[in-house]
């Protein structure tokens, strides 16, 4: 047998040498395929030989084990027969060991080993029986299963993943017929100096490389997961920051909304007070805001305590007042909280008192009250005349008596007394606050009176000093020339000065005005026309105009900017460059009728516009002009900033409309339109095509009550 194997190996090696010398690639592929088949055969033969060797060794072990077992059983039988006469002697020795206890573990192991061998023989016997009785198809299926299991174990040793376990040479997505065999890269092995290695060594190196690549892939996968986790953490942090920012913004919106509702409630109160249909809550709100207002606006209201307004109110109005007070308390968010809490206590007490009276009148109240009607007046006398501090001490004593619950104490009486005491304490606090407010207003009134008295005393002295200064500056008057003495105007001038110094004479009227001649210039200012006499028709028209200004002072045209409009104008001025100038070419529009429901007077909005000018260096200007003698500037764009601080509907965005002029096509009218109370406003601009790109400076937005429309004109360049 060994000689045959050596001959076979010699033939295969000689065949490999011949195949190695042949330069044909097809023959080399066939040679590799034959070599692979021979390796498979050698491997199968080696496995079969190892299997037979193992079976032979197993049989020899079984035989030797059976011999040992038989030998032990014979010795046991002989020892048992010889131990019967010597049992008495062995039992008499106290230190002799007991054989059954010592040999019991050995017996157990032997029994288990014997049972295992029996089961193994049974399995082997059944397997042999199945092989003997199986059909050729079953035999092929069994060998195929064994081959697949063997291939599975080999792939596991090679480190294949579960993803590639189902691939085979015939069925794989790569189209590789040698997928299961190790790839032999001869050129690479030659470069690396590993061409002399055996196939098994190459397989081991390939397996190590594969395991190293797998570990590297695991590291890459782990790093990718860590990056994804870090990115998720960053996104969560950004989301939390965004949520916090939105929460702050929402709280700001909520605060602005509450402030808006509070301003609207105050505005409604002012309108009702001005129209003579004020509610109790309007007067209370006016009383609370009186501390920050001028003296003359709320002096009449402040002469009485605020709870005096509750006298004579029915139950329905008291309930409405209680709801309104709670609304104001919620809108003001802690401002004047003590005042509103005291008013709630007083209103609730008054409401309970009136409800009790109604129930007694209708005979529906059958429950005994804590205080008898006979002593109600005495209880009121106890509370009357005490300040807030004394009432607070009384409250502590009553609460201590109620919490003590001593024998003989009427708890219901003291509880009713405590409920009334709270209302009296609220009235006392409001009374003290009212007295402090009156003292403050009184001191302010005294200071104003002192200032007025001082001004009245100083005014005549100032006028006399001015007259003396004028006389000193007039040299002609000091010289006293006869021409000046004869001048009637000089005497008249002195008379006027004396009248002004006396501060009681009427204004001088010219003699020609006594005829009742009307002023020919109707556009004369009010101070200049004050000394004129009017006819009855003109006087009536002037009186009506003054009455209208008194009833509606908001309709007076005031060119002075408010602080808010001044702040908006300064904001619009920011970023103004040297090539920009202020632009205010406003055009007239047809009168647009306003709605009857407008709450504010119609008026035009304020604005701050800029015009952007510059040089256009076209071919003609480059030829005829230079930087020392530049061409005339042209309009290159506009920046309109229209202010709408009092816009009623902030959701209605202002709009603009561009209409070319009918008489001149080079100009157009840019009209801005929005809701009440603002009227439309229009400007006359150059009619050219706009640049609507934000990169070119276009802006159309309504932000911070400012409507901004910024644009530049397109520049056309000549191209051949």
UniProtKB/Swiss-Prot annotation:
GO cellular component, one term: catalytic step 2 spliceosome
Coiled coil: 109-159, 206-236, 346-375
Modified residues (Phosphoserine): 99, 104
Chain intervals with Basic and acidic residues compositional bias: 16-67, 113-156, 512-521
GO biological process: cellular response to virus; dorsal/ventral axis specification; mRNA cis splicing, via spliceosome; mRNA splicing, via spliceosome; positive regulation of antimicrobial humoral response; positive regulation of Toll signaling pathway
Compositional bias per record (Acidic residues), positions renumbered to this chain: 465-489, 522-539
Localization terms from the record: Nucleus; Cytoplasm
Keywords: Coiled coil, Cytoplasm, Developmental protein, Nucleus, Phosphoprotein
Molecular-function GO term, any one: RNA binding
Principal location class: nucleus
InterPro entries: Cactin_C, Cactin_central
Top-level lineage group: Eukaryota
Biased amino acid composition, Low complexity: 79-92
Ranges of Basic residues composition bias in the record: 1-15, 68-78
Region span, Disordered: 1-156, 449-492, 512-541
Tissue localization of expression: Expressed in ovary (at protein level).
Similarity annotation: Belongs to the CACTIN family.
Function: Plays a role in pre-mRNA splicing by facilitating excision of a subset of introns. Plays a role during early embryonic development. Involved in the dorsal-ventral embryonic patterning. Probably acts as a negative regulator of the NF-kappa-B (Rel) signaling pathway.
Subunit structure: Interacts with cact.
Name of the protein: Splicing factor Cactin
Organism per entry: Drosophila melanogaster
């Amino acid at each position: 047998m060994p000689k045959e194997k050596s001959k076979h190996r010699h033939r295969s090696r000689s065949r490999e040498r011949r195949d190695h010398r042949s330069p044909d690639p097809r023959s080399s592929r066939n040679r590799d395929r034959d070599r692979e088949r021979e390796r498979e055969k050698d491997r199968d033969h080696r496995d079969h030989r190892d299997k037979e060797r193992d079976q032979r060794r197993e049989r020899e072990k079984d035989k030797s084990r059976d011999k040992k077992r038989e030998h032990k059983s014979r010795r046991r039988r002989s020892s048992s027969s010889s131990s019967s006469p010597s049992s008495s002697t062995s039992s008499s020795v106290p230190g002799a060991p007991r054989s059954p206890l010592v040999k019991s573990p050995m017996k157990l192991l032997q029994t288990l080993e014997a049972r295992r061998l029996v089961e193994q023989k049974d399995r082997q016997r059944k397997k042999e029986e199945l092989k003997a009785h199986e059909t050729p198809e079953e035999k092929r299926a069994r060998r195929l299963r064994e081959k697949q299991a063997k291939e599975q174990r080999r792939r596991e040793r090679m480190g294949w993943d579960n993803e590639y376990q189902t691939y085979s040479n015939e069925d794989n997505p790569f189209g590789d017929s040698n997928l299961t065999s190790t790839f032999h890269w001869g050129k690479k092995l030659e470069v690396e100096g590993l061409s002399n290695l055996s196939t098994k060594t190459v397989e081991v190196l390939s397996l190590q490389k594969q395991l190293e690549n797998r570990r590297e892939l695991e590291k890459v996968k782990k790093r990718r997961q860590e990056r994804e986790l870090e990115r998720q953490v960053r996104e969560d942090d950004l989301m939390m920051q965004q949520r916090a920012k939105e929460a702050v913004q929402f709280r700001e919106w909520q605060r602005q909304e509450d402030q808006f509702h509070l301003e609207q409630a105050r505005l409604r109160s002012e309108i009702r007070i001005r129209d003579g249909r004020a509610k109790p809550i309007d007067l209370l709100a006016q009383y609370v805001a009186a501390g920050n207002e001028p003296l003359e606006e709320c002096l009449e209201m402040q002469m009485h305590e605020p709870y005096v307004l509750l006298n004579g109110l029915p139950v329905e109005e008291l309930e409405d007042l209680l709801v309104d007070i709670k609304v104001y308390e919620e809108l003001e968010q802690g401002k004047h909280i003590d005042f509103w809490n005291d008013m709630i206590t007083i209103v609730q007490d008054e409401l309970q008192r009136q409800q009790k009276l109604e129930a007694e009148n209708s005979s529906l109240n059958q429950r005994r009250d804590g205080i008898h009607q006979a002593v109600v007046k005495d209880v009121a006398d106890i509370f009357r005349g005490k300040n807030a501090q004394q009432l607070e001490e009384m409250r502590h004593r009553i609460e201590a008596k109620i919490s003590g619950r001593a024998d003989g104490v009427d708890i219901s009486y003291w509880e009713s007394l405590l409920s009334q005491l709270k209302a009296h304490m609220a009235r006392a606090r409001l009374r003290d606050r009212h007295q402090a407010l009156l003292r403050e207003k009184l001191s302010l009134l005294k200071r104003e009176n002192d200032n007025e008295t001082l001004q009245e005393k100083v005014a005549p002295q100032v006028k006399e000093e001015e007259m003396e200064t004028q006389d000193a500056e007039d040299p002609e008057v000091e010289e006293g020339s006869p021409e000046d003495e004869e001048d009637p105007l000089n005497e008249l001038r002195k008379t006027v000065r004396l009248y002004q110094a006396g501060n009681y004479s009427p204004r001088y009227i010219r003699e020609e005005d006594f005829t009742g001649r009307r002023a020919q210039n109707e556009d004369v200012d009010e101070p200049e026309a004050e000394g004129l006499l009017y006819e009855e028709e003109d006087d009536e028209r002037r009186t009506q105009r003054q009455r209208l200004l008194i009833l509606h002072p908001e309709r007076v045209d005031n060119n002075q900017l408010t602080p808010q409009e001044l702040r908006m104008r300064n904001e619009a001025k920011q970023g103004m460059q040297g090539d920009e100038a202020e632009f205010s070419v406003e055009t007239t529009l047809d009168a647009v009728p306003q709605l009857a429901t407008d709450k504010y007077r119609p008026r035009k909005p304020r604005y701050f516009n800029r015009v952007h000018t510059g040089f256009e260096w076209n071919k003609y200007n480059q030829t005829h002009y230079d930087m020392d003698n530049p061409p005339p500037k042209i309009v290159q764009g506009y920046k309109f900033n229209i202010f709408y601080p009092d816009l009623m509907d902030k959701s209605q965005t202002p709009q603009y409309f561009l209409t070319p002029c009918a008489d001149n096509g080079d100009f157009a009218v840019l009209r801005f339109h929005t809701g009440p109370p603002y009227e439309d406003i229009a400007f006359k601009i150059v009619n050219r095509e706009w640049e609507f790109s934000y990169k070119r400076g276009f802006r159309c937005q309504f932000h911070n009550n400012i409507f901004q429309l910024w644009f530049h004109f397109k520049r056309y360049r000549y191209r051949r």
